[in-house]
Amino acid sequence: MVKSPCSPVTTGKKRCRAKPQKKDEDTTDKGKLDEGPLDATKEMNGVGKGDSRAACKRPRRAAACSDFKEKSVRLSDKSSVVATNGNKMEEEEMDAVKLTKLGPEVQRPCRKLIDFILHDADGKLQPFEMSEIDDFFITALIMPMDDDLEKDRQKGVRCEGFGRIEDWAISGYDEGTAVVWVSTEVADYECVKPAGNYKSYYDHFYEKAQVCVEVYRKLARSVGGNPNLGLEELLASVVRSINAIKGYSGTLSKDFVISNGEFVYNQLIGLDETANTDDEKFATLPVLLALRDGCKSRVEVSKLQPNISNGSLKINDAECKEVSEDDDEKLARLLQQEEEWKMMKQRGKRGTTSQKNVYIKISEAEIANDYPLPAYYKPSSQEMDEYIFDSEDSFYSDVPVRILNNWALYNADSRLIPLELIPMKAGAENDIVVFGSGFMREDDGSCCSTAESAKLSSSSSSNHQDAGVSIYLSPIKEWVIEFGGSMICITIRTDVAWYKLRQPTKQYAPWCEPVLKTARLSVSIITLLKEQSRASKLSFADVIKKVAEFDKGSPAFVSSNVALVERYIVVHGQIILQQFSDFPDETIRRSAFATGLLMKMEQRRHTKLVMKKKVQVMRGENLNPSATMGPASRRKVMRATTTRLINRIWSDYYTHHFPEDSKDADVNEAKEIDDELEENEDEDAEEEAQIEEENVSKTPPSTRSRKLVSQTCKEIRWEGEAIGKTPSGEALYKCAYVRELRINLGRTVALEDDSGELVMCFVEYMFQKLNGAKMVHGRLLQKGSETVLGNAANERDLFLTNECLEFELEDIKELMSVNLQSLPWGHKYRKENAEADRIERAKAEDRKKKGLPMEYLCKSLYWPEKGAFFSLPHDKLGLGNGFCSSCQQKEPDCDELQILSKNSFIYRNITYNVNDYLYIRPDFFSQEEDRATFKGGRNVGLKPYVVCHLLDVHEPAGSRKIHPASTKISVRRFYRPDDISSAKAYVSDIREVYYSENIVKVPVDMIEGKCEVKKKIDISNSDVPVMVEHEFFCEHFYDPATGALKQLPPNVKLMSVQQKATGALKKNKGKQICESDQVDSDKCTKVSKENRLATLDIFAGCGGLSEGLQQAGVSFTKWAIEYEEPAGEAFTKNHPEAAVFVDNCNVILKAIMDKCGDADDCISTSEAAEQAAKFSQDNIMNLPVPGEVEFINGGPPCQGFSGMNRFNQSPWSKVQCEMILAFLSFAEYFRPRFFLLENVRNFVSFNKGQTFRLTVASLLEMGYQVRFGILEAGTFGVAQSRKRAFIWAAAPGETLPDWPEPMHVFASPELKINLPDGKYYAAAKSTAGGAPFRAITVRDTIGDLPKVENGASKLLLEYGGEPISWFQKKIRGNTIALNDHISKEMNELNLIRCQRIPKRPGCDWHDLPDEKVKLSSGQLVDLIPWCLPNTAKRHNQWKGLYGRLDWEGNFPTSVTDPQPMGKVGMCFHPDQDRIITVRECARSQGFPDNYQFAGNIQSKHRQIGNAVPPPLAFALGRKLKEAVDAKRQ
């Protein structure tokens, strides 16, 4: 054993101590070395002192400069004393050793080295162990063998380039801490502390040395070791011990120990020479031999011999120096170990979480030999763009799942591409674009492996046997492998859908095979690991060996050659890692094989792709080469037809504001991007969480007060006499002078606030305070870019606001040129106004070029708190009478309470009197019940407001401050049927309440508005299932103690509406209810056509929007435009008096403008012009013309609104996006009185909100008043979650319609639109905390319909019973026969699954038993869709797939094709084994039973799924009718 630290065991002897000097080398003695500059091209040799060793190389040193400039400097005595902070420098090692001697030395000198580096003769730093290969030298601070080195650094002597290193050694085995020694001819040196720049080089070797020490201590009996340990036990023990060392950085792995097994073995057998005779010999120790052999086997695996010819390497006919094979291999091995160690340390520093941020890309070069020779894809002549089938509102988290058969993948050059080049993780920043083609059909839940013959799958019913639609895909973003049993299924994702891959094309099959082979191999390895007692029992190397032993007949066989097996597994490693990461068993995911594979992949230095935090759906144009290579698509591409005004607005914007270049983008864009990704139509689980934590209060109306920078100015005076006085007696003036500026009423002035920002104010009136201060009362003006318009606004546009500011005249900095514009309105003035605008823009551009001040335009009042732009109130601006219209309409604090008397009070601007009926929040009476969280039962447990009768007002005692929370009222509680039971609620009128003797005291802050309780004969009735009045009736008495329900006693008198003062109860929740609200709704449908708005419905579909608007009695659809024939046919059936044009709206607009002689104002394609010219004379006669259309409504297709569309060439998806241009062009050309745009909720955030902002900007440019908002259909009386964005526009002089009030409880958060400065606007508050009426349930909606079977196809049926619920009575009306109660037919397997889904709320695929079933074909298949369990974590547990509806819940978002494996998934009837029928879907949307649909069952479902719910349209129509009636009155 090693006893003396100065006598280490030398186990690292170099094979050759010194290389002989060549005859042609220059020799330089010491004296010449120091004389001057040396030739850098010559080798430098030192001469040994008194021995026969060959001369060794000395390192090069910097040449000394001999051309110094001299300057005489006089130093003071003090300055001439120099304090030496550095160490002594010595040229010769011998001198340095002598200077550091502490006393007499009998043995060979031993010293310590700190701040050392090892380098070659050229001064380049070199790894420690490379000294075995070449001559290395040392530069260090040589210290005596002292204990406290840092304290006595001054004792050290610095020596540069000494040595060479003759050998090295390791000691410290007994102590447990490795000590590394190096020896030169002069002395032995203990390596204590490397220099900072050398630490990374030295640490690798030191860790190897520490491994040697730890292995020794685990095996040597003399220090308590056990030589009989097994290899796995030894590895685990060593790794655990080293990782536990205090101060050890990084994480040591078993692989690191194994990879250095031979090194450890060679060091320890060197100790056998000094070992006791009783000790075990390390050279023959089985565990040490196993460690060495494990290392050797790894070396052999890594030797993939390249085809290199024999002989030495020649470059330009010059032969390189021969290097022995042993040295060459050793050098390669050391370099490889160095790289592996660095990778291990990096992983240790990053920790496990950092791996989530990168994706190791598979190298195409490394997998090339596993694939066929290059080939190219030829597109089918029938291929269609997948964007055509894009769901309206699908985003990443809920895109539909489809099947792709007969598929192939290729790049932009149409070259066939391996699937594994695409990242397998969502969000990886990919650097390769891969497209695909194939035959697409909807997923029917059938089980079939990728590349499996279709005949083996569980086929669906006959209507799914077709091959599908031939499509070409947009770029593939990610892919996954799912496996179960013997099945392996590959699924790819584009921005439009997930596609389960079935059989590839014959040409592409060889390109698919390596991926499937690797997937099968991965499954075999997982099976192998599961068979072990511990998954980590088998290391990476062990698994490689076992895979090499697979039978050749195995589907996972790769090769019998271990080296080839490892290469295959590593180069295809991402496929295997993905399957491991998705495996539910954590021990498999964290197995030694998986971590070893990841390390091996990292060692190959592959490209690492950055992982993004969020997956961004970027659906721009489809760049698939098949779009241009194949013949024309079956659906012709046509650019939008536009008017010149719309074309200018949009093209100017995209010319100046490309998304990637926009520097002045809206400050909310970043947030809007996040919103766009988070907004999903099917948000059940997420929204429930939001409802709990979200406050339903909006940003309060802004009342900014700016601190202005005042300046003393003597040149301020009034002109003329006072023209009146303010209400407080202050003198009013018409004109003033500030310096040379003349300030008049109605002018705009600029101020400067304390931040130096210019503020523009419109002068309302000027007055002089009683203290003499000359003041201005003004209204702030905002630049368009500061409004919701953002960068879509014109730089010259200003908007008047309701924010007022009072300031002194002396604060005015300058006058601004602002024109309060008011142009004549109507289609007759279009061209006149357009010409005036052209002249104005040219003038502004000329002023800009000349550097003159900008002249601003102000056309509208911006009111963000109402989400609207209004016409300027010209008749109320700048009157100078001391009154401001903005200040007058400001409402006081909405929570303010004012006690008027013992019998009345005002709260939230509503007056309450004793005997009034009012709403109380339900949470006052009972704690909110726990609501179920299963998909579809979202409204279960939500309560409507409690109807109460105000009996008394209790004023606070004494001088106590009046506060809504402390002021109490006494009320009588009325109960509802749903307070008794859901069964009672189902059979009762939704407006019925029960009288009780329950009298309670309630805080005023629990009040939510007023209502009326009447006799049943006094309440209004309607055939429409929509509540618009706050009316209830009472006929029964309820005793909550006994549960008894009795007829209302005669002595109980309910106030009828006649006993109320007219209009006294017209307010509810702060909003004035118009008299029209109280009229019988039947009268709405009887309004004559002449008194309705003549309406044009564009993108009409089957007519849901028109139906609701006509039911409201406000519109009559005279014209409708629809592209799809079945939808157009359905519209005609239900609106026979309308002229329905089933054609492209671009062609129709062109035909109309040609008819009216305005072809010069029309921008269209030649194709549109050709088709318009082919219109029959009858069609042309029926076309509307400007002046006839009073109302335009519609919902332009929204599939293309996502992505970056930039007015460049693109296919169908771009055309759909441009439909908004055609829609706006209809409005611009016809100039109707009212305009309504409907779209998906995400319309406001698509494209970073650009499309939404440009739409609003276009309407404002036309001169319209505009209001924007988002509404939830479920709050207006349908049993379905459906969020829609709306934009109202009203002509100048018209009343801009307000938003309808949500009337039903529904679990939906406040639907916000983000505004600048962190504010937001919500058109309606959330009703999750209460509403006037309960939610409509699935039972309310379809509980009366007769039972039908799977695949029911009979179009007409008898009802078989009377309607039960209030909703059923309204929706059925006078319909006698039930039509379209037909159901899609499921395949055999899905029908079995449906039958096995329990008939209780919330049940879905999770409730299926884990077993196999035999189909009629004899095939045995899994009852649980095998692909779901392994991917549930990634897809929110696939919640709702194969789900049953809840009788007491609601329908999920209406989809165009209900499928058990579809985007929504919950489509099974609550207690029947089938998919919901067409009529049930129609009722969920609020279509009356007499409404007809057209085409096959798929077309009917599509018409319903794309429609606006008629009850929501009805509620909007009621508000439009109020606006129309207000003008008439």
UniProtKB/Swiss-Prot annotation:
CDD domains: BAH_plantDCM_II (cd04708). It catalyses: a 2'-deoxycytidine in DNA + S-adenosyl-L-methionine = a 5-methyl-2'-deoxycytidine in DNA + S-adenosyl-L-homocysteine + H(+). GO terms for cellular component: nucleus. The keyword DNA-binding applies. Its EC number is 2.1.1.37. Residues 697-706 have a biased composition (Polar residues). Residues 674-694 have a biased composition (Acidic residues). It is found in: Nucleus. The active site is at C1198. It holds the Pfam family DNA_methylase. Expressed in roots and inflorescences. Expressed in roots, panicles, anthers, pistils, endosperm and imbibed embryos. Expressed in tissues containing actively replicating and dividing cells, such as shoot and root meristems. GO terms for biological process: DNA methylation-dependent constitutive heterochromatin formation; embryo development ending in seed dormancy; genomic imprinting; methylation; negative regulation of gene expression via chromosomal CpG island methylation. Residues 741-873, 910-1049 form the BAH domain. Residues 21-35 have a biased composition (Basic and acidic residues). Major CG methylase that methylates chromatin CpG residues and maintains DNA methylation. Plays a major role in genomic imprinting, regulation of embryogenesis and seed viability. Maintains DNA methylation at the FIE1 gene locus in the embryo. Belongs to the class I-like SAM-binding methyltransferase superfamily. C5-methyltransferase family. This is DNA (cytosine-5)-methyltransferase 1B. It comes from Oryza sativa subsp. japonica (Rice).
